[in-house]
């Protein structure tokens, strides 16, 4: 709970001053939290992005009820899981937009974000039983990462009440991937 609070405060600060100006030291000063206390959780500013992603995944996992997916298609399960992730991240949307914008010339930041999202996509593919020992299984995580990335950018600018633009984009991309997989599976 302490870490979650620090992540929230960190993301609020990122929203206020941007990624470039953000640092663990600045968080310590502004929030009057001893630096050595913050360093228990975050070794550097990049750590907060890593811990954030893991926190989001943990929150999703705690809300999952596998039995709700028993009669759902793989596509529907992936859709629900990704929408759960967007819902979990909603309060951090503007901070995430600033981080994404700053990442364009920050290879280390891109690497951390990519690694975490790839791990999440692997987790989602496992939950949806999408791996089936097919020769193309190794591509699934990359395709899902691509789908997530495009949908993420749509989500960042989606101000509709029910995230209808995000849902439409995600459904369109997952349907295209499903059609592609069916064609490839027929080889």
Where are these regions (language model features)?
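Amphipathic alpha-helical segments used for helix-helix packing
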Residues: 88-108, 121-125
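N-terminal positioning helix adjacent to the helix-turn-helix/winged-helix DNA-binding module
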Residues: 1-9
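Hydrophobic/aromatic-rich alpha-helical bundle segments in the mid-to-C-terminal region
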Residues: 130-176, 180-187
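Helix-turn-helix
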Residues: 5, 13-51
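Hydrophobic alpha-helical connector segments
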Residues: 51, 65-98
């Amino acid at each position: 709970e302490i870490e979650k609070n620090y992540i929230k405060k960190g993301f609020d600060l990122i929203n206020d001053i941007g990624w470039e100006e953000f640092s663990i030291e600045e968080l310590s000063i502004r929030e009057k939290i001893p630096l050595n206390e913050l360093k228990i959780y975050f070794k550097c500013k990049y750590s907060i992005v890593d811990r954030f992603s893991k926190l989001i995944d943990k929150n999703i996992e705690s809300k999952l009820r596998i039995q709700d997916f028993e009669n759902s298609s793989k596509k529907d399960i992936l859709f629900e899981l990704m929408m759960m992730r967007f819902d979990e991240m909603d309060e951090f949307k503007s901070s995430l937009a600033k981080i994404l914008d700053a990442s364009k010339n920050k290879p280390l930041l891109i690497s951390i974000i990519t690694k975490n999202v790839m791990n999440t996509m692997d987790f989602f593919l496992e939950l949806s039983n999408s791996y089936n020992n097919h020769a193309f299984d190794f591509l699934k995580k990359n395709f899902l990462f691509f789908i997530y990335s495009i949908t993420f950018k749509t989500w960042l600018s989606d101000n509709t009440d029910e995230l209808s633009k995000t849902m439409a984009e995600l459904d369109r991309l997952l349907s295209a991937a499903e059609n592609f997989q069916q064609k490839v599976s027929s080889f």
